[in-house]
């Protein structure tokens, strides 16, 4: 869902006011009311990114489709492992499933994972397969790639599901994220602002705890 950033700023101000019992908001820092609003706005995208990374899949919404050419290192379509170049704004995988897989994958590994080394083994029994597929997000020279292990269907193979969560970005005064995460993002933004402008550790901790509670 798309939100007006200025509306979110107002909600963050309310969260700060409602949770701060030690001193008025305007005394949190040396800035004016306008500068505090600017600080809030500057934290919203970062707060949204952190919450989107930490929230469970069930709260993330529909995301965006992954499209692009599939490359098959084996030289044979639909045999072995493949990879797809991910969009520049990729943040997190929502789901991925090839047409011959029994299940969809949302949890990924990277090149530093012990499981990743197994995918390069010459023994098929320990690599990802249509019954227990594995997806890795790996940095190539051309950008991030989604590597998937593996397929056996041959030339009739296709992508059944492929969706991702994009890095949140403020554009034309608006930002997009799942409505299920709105309250958590508001409170995490308030937490980040309080970290910068308040010395009250209990106040800061309270905001963080509320943000975390909202994504359980």
What positions do the PLM features span?
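Glycine-enriched, solvent-exposed interface loops adjoining structured elements
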Residues: 1-216
